From Swiss-Prot:
The keyword Aminoacyl-tRNA synthetase does not apply. Its main location: secreted. One of its GO terms (biological process) is defense response. This is Dermaseptin-3.4TR. Expressed by the skin glands. Keywords: Amphibian defense peptide, Antimicrobial, Secreted. Belongs to the frog skin active peptide (FSAP) family. Dermaseptin subfamily. Has antimicrobial activity.
Length: 30
């Protein structure tokens, strides 16, 4: 449902933000 979609979207956003933060710390993913 909508709630599950929101949770999945939030998780994806958090994952992206975490990757960006870690990348800025000096650990590029790619």
């Amino acid at each position: 449902g909508l709630f599950k979609t929101l949770i999945k979207g939030a998780g994806k956003m958090l994952g992206h933000v975490a990757k960006e933060f870690l990348g800025s710390e000096g650990e590029p993913e790619s």
